[in-house]
Amino acid sequence: MPELLAHYPFTDTAYHELLDRQGGVRPHWQRLFRQLERSSPEQLRQRQALVERQIQENGVTYNVYADPKGTDRPWALDLLPNLLSAAEWQPIAAGVAQRARLLNALLADLYGDQRLLAEGLLPSELVFGHPNFLWPALGIRPPGGIFLHSYAVDLARDADGRWQVLADRTQAPSGAGYALENRQIVSRALPELYRDLRVQHLAGYFRTLQETLASQAAGDGETPLVVLLTPGRFNETYFEHLYLARQLGFPLVEGHDLTVRDATLYLKTLGGLKRVHAVLRRLDDDFCDPLELRTDSALGIPGLLEAVRQGRVLVANALGSGVLESPGLLGFLPQACRRLLGEELALPSLDTRWCGEPQALEAILAALPDLVIKPAFPGQRCEPLFGHALDSAGLASLGERLRERPQAYVAQRLAQLSQAPVWRDGEAGVGLQSRAIGMRVFAVAASDGRYWVMPGGLTRVASAADAEVVSMQRGGASKDTWVLAERAVGGEPLRPRRLGVRDLVREDPYLPSRVVENLFWCGRYAERCDDHARLLRVVLSRYVDADGDEEALRSALALAGGIGLLPGDGEPLERRLLRALLDEHWPASLCANLRRLHWAAAQVRGRLSGENWLALLELQRDMQALDPARTDLGEALDFLNRLVMSLAALSGFALDDMTRDDGWRFLMIGRRIERVRFFAESIAAFLDGGSAWDAGALEWLLELGNSGITYRSRYLASPQLVPVLDLLLLHEQNPHSLRFQLQALERSLERLHEEFGAPRERELRTLGERLRSFDLAALESPLFGAAGLDEVLVGLARLLRDIAACAGQVSDRLGLRYFAHVDDVSQRTVST
């Protein structure tokens, strides 16, 4: 690849990670640079494609709040890692470890004796005015005195190559999981380079976190249960929560999965309440307990703070640690370090001054064009303001705001970010380009209180060459961060503890009720989408067929309208059919049900295989690609054909890929309940519709029941009522028959009775027995002629409607007993 640096922008106003001041390649970058020179654009293009394919296959995503379509956006990762030599890394690691010790000691002081406040080393307005200073947490001392179990710091390198701290992340630091995922992807894309450069491993960080939480948890002699608390799937880093939970072996839970009883935290599982000993939270401080903190929080656990206060549960990081994330504190840390640790602060902060100091305010106002103004506290609706970007009127207005509320703002010198090479292949050309970067470094507390720094981190890349801010929310990308060792590094994967026969686990002991509930509804919505797609396909195929059977179309439309699948009669039929498919505001539309399926599946993404999740995403994309205003019936019919095949693949994933545990059982129960309800209602409506003896109508009924091929192969005749009803209602070997589904549902419910002591569903069993005892011969020789025949069909339709209603009642009782944990007596109270 000749002239690799011919178009690489090189300036002396910023530090270049790749190049020294003379434009030469730095020593620790030379091995990577030589490989780039030997590689053709096509080879690098293939490696970048491998990175992107791995991201897609692994489902690595990041939610961008500002983008309405930003949910589950693919993670952006550059092919080229950011390299740091061992000599460069050592002072960084030492400085980060010292800073973690300092901030831990600072939290102990703020929620303890408050010596720094009493001595005037910290302004009380910065502490007590911070919304994340939690007065209810005052006096709480966590086990071992560890407030910060994990810590992250955002670093940038100035033009002279010196590292400076931009921000401290103390309450729920994110990014470590993404750093590990980046490592696994890039090391596969550049395997020879990764081996030859002797890159230090990241696994020690995660192993230390596991060990610390387990050792510090309030166990009372029990094996500690540690959970990872997430705000849910709409959090920007939800993928990381899933990924960390899998890597660490912690159940991923949301606030309503947990409950506090007698100052003890419990996980609500299918088998009852299980005590939780430690919580690794990804939830901000004030959302954690609506009882004592933010009362409008729907994400936290009422009573959690009291459980912490009583020493019954460990929360990492300690509640209230978010107070240290105020940028206003940065300027006071050097003197705090001397007072608390007796040391000089090794890693300096970016020059930052709090506007609440009168002397500082005057100096800030005089230098506004050269500064960046930021809010002093989180929650203020104010983006950073760059003084150099404001005109004289804007500067005057900003000055007035600072004078009115000086304590609400801080001023920082504009950070001069270092530049790193990125691989670009686009309209601007192929080759190396330069982008501003920042680096987030992570530290974890060991059980003895010392901090271990991850040798690497998350390098974030600006979205454009002229970007002044590095932010994933603003479209930025990431890099893997390689810290090079001076000698060969031994293999160090994430080594789990050695497991023996005594450790074997056949069932998930910590399956949250919420997970089971969402799997149950995954099953119901998947089956509902399949049923509705098949019925719409029946109607559309006969509607677009100019030479079709009018009676078959009439009966199919009557059925679709009778069970509520079609909107009202006030519109043309073609419009009603398209609305039934594509109108997301019509509750019974296929589009609305696919959206519900995606929602339920997203809640249990960690329980689904990668292939299963990708198939669900593909379903959603296919539906979104259809424009309701432009789609015609032919396109709609083609989509329905593809949709039925995709839903069949989803069903296959459930049958072949999932472990037959309680979660799978409830998924299948959900499918069977939905199938029984739909098919019983549909055949009842068909029998009442007056077309029971019409061959064309019976043909589409077989198609709806996915049994047309079976019928033709057995009877070699046009459809007739008696054999059709036998195949669809009574055939015990046809997996699509009502009898087969009822028996499978009864077996699953009996299993719940045996495992959990649930009351038997006697009414459903009785109705199933009545169906199985139905004599089809009554349709051949009725006692009272045609009137008797009609009475038989009416009675059968009534029985089918009773079965459908009973299946719905079974669903309600399952929800009360297993998802809401309402006991049997309370269920009877609710039902009356």
Feature-to-residue mapping (PLM):
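Fold-independent oxyanion-binding glycine-rich loops
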Residues: 153, 168-169, 231-232, 282-283, ...
